[in-house]
Amino acid sequence: MSKPDRLAILALAVLAVAASSAQAQHQYIGYVYPAGGQQGSTFAIRLGGQRLTYASDPVVSGEGVSVRLIAYYRVMGNQEMSLLRQQLRTLQKKGATVSDAMAAKMAFFELPKRVKPPEVRGIVCDACGRLNPPFATVCSNCNAKLVKPKAPKPGKPAAKQTPSEMEAARQKLIERIQRRFAEDERNPAVRAHMELVFAEVTVAPDARPGRREIRVITKHGISNALPFYIGQVPEVARRPMKTCRKPVLGKEHLAQRRRPTDEALVRVTLPCTMNGQIAAGEVNRYRFPANKGQRLVITTKARHLVPYVADGVPGWFQAVLRLHDDEGNEVAYNDDFRFDPDPVLYYEVPEDGDYVLTINEALFRGRESFTYRITIGELPYVTSIFPLGARAGQPVKIEANGWNLDDTVLSPPAKDAKPGRHLIAATRGNLMSNDVPFALDTLPECRDAEPNNAPAKAQKVTLPIIVNGRADRPGDWDVFEVQGKAGQTLVAEVHARRLGSPFDSFVKVTGPDGKIIALNDDHYDAASGLNTDHADSYLMAKLPADGKYFVHIGDTRRHAGKAYAYRLRISHPRPDVELRVVPSRICIRSKSSVAVTVYAIRKDGFDGPVKLSFKDLPKGLVSSGATLAAKKDVTRLAIKTTLTEMEGPLNLTVIGSMKVGEKTIVRQAVPAEDRMQAFLWRHLLPAETLPVLVYNPSYRPPTDRIRPPIPDSIRPKNAKRTLRKSTVNWYLRQIESLYQQWYLTDDFANRQIANIEARLIR
């Protein structure tokens, strides 16, 4: 796609976003922390976002993962926070008590579980800092004598007193309010992260490891999806950071997080996955023991957790890893893995000792959504495969390159897998490596055969064909000879970067006289939403005469190696279209209608109309479909409902059908979110599902708490009447809201109401 075409799509995206403002105002989550957990574990998470009122249990895609809502913290106004502050002071007074109803409520009320680092178990050497087993007497690293921590002096055992039910309720209410204050930030850097959802995740022992997606469901809609990973090794998580304060020029230090000294460095044992968040100016450190000969793989997920940031350059969390030995020497460094911004390190341990891994943001930026997951261990990791794909239904042997791949098996997709992009992984027993993409197609395939680096030695191929090749040596060119006729159109398309290969292709077509007919370096693919390095080539060339032609392919930077693989399709045009539906969830008001935006990424010159529709809509939902006009790239698809509300979301499917000659082709649309990167660029970020929810906009939770009558004895007698009725009603709504959320006691609420009503101007 040319630059003007790309800018046209960006302009259409902006218009579509403006047209779908109703959809854009629905629920949003900006981060989840921690962004995953181990198989067979139960752990606490928090999600930050906006418009999450009346949240219910979040959902994670796939099988084997359940999520339970614990609490929701909305953004409270200044008056509400003032009321809570007064209530807290009242509860902390000597003799303060609560009602029977409050005691009964607090007895079953669950506070959000804390996310915190593991406790250090063992003896830390004062000389070198090595963590030793609790029973050790000398350090295993430097042989220094270990000093065991002194046990507390025995004193007179305190009489065990179980607090009364009323006292326990009072203490829990105090803690609840204190936690609410601890999370409050009046001047946040990112207002879209101010609302918090606290939940508990349970992962089954047999849950498939890898990437999932998590969403928050509310009574008023569904949030966007965020990546959520299931791991296979033990995990630790640092304490979550409070919502970042907005930095002020010249006083940026006031917005930085001041981590307690005991949290500056976390001790872990391998293998391990570490979860954390990066604040502005912060460096997170992890100390671990390693033995000589260990082959450690250190992988990071940072940009993969929150792919795009709209208000920053670079438009994501650019993580930097450094590994230091016991003496503080830097022994390894990485800030990306090839074209992937998330760093990966491989380190063969030269000698026994403690090592310290650090992570920071490249520009020392930070915010609560700069979350990361680092996994360290002697774990299998696939760096490249060959070939990058195969013909659907045909057997193929895949060569895997990487680290710690001894005794692993890398299997292709199932024999009945459909054409498209699939994820495969190397396995050793139940242990899985990272996922790598593998393409399936219906065209015949072959391998490139050396020597074929010049037209005189060109490899002859018959159209259509997909060539699986790679750059064997620096400056290598692969040349393929094809037969063509005058007026025919020849297509040459490379899939390399989109399949995880570092190969930066350059393609050209020449005639028998060596004259260049067409060439291309980079081609923008809007369907590749997570990719910002569009290095794959694509060209269409009209042949001037009958005869032989040569298709040349090489690496632009003259790089080569086993990892530099490619798939080159040489064929006549295969008119097609890829569809994206935005947003990736549909929220419909009672007995109303909405419209989603459908984008078409046209292939090989297809410019015909596309008929769009929802497939197998459930009862109560109807759509008359839509037609994407010829040569257009975006349209709207409406859906309406006769329902008042739905109990829960259902997944929908959008399909598009088109005529290519006498053949009808049907394509399924991929749900996506329209995301901005670095103030300008927009990307269609794919999601796994397209859920729909019909909601009742007038829903309010039942008021299950009845306030007792206000005694005349607490009503002020001679209060100055300075408040209008509208102001009084506003105050009363604030009090009633907190009261129904069980933040206020009966006595405190009645006294506040009495004071406000006494100031009403009559």
Where are these regions (language model features)?
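Short, cysteine/histidine-rich loop/knuckle motifs that typically chelate Zn2+
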Residues: D126-A127, N141
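Acidic, Ser/Thr/Pro-rich low-complexity intrinsically disordered segments
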Residues: Q25-T90, R267-M432, L440, P444, ...
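Bacterial N-terminal signal peptides
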Residues: A8-A18
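Aromatic sugar-binding surface patches on proteins
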Residues: A182, A189-E200, D340-P343, T408, ...
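Surface-exposed binding patches on compact interaction domains or structured appendages
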Residues: S56-K116, G155-A189, G605-T627
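Ligand-binding face of N-terminal immunoglobulin V-set domains in extracellular IgSF glycoproteins
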Residues: Q39-R51, V60, S82-A96, S164-Y229, ...
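Predominantly extracellular/luminal regions of secreted and cell-surface proteins
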Residues: P227-T269, G429-I465
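Short Cys/His-rich micro-motifs in 6-15 aa windows
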Residues: N143-A151, E757-I761
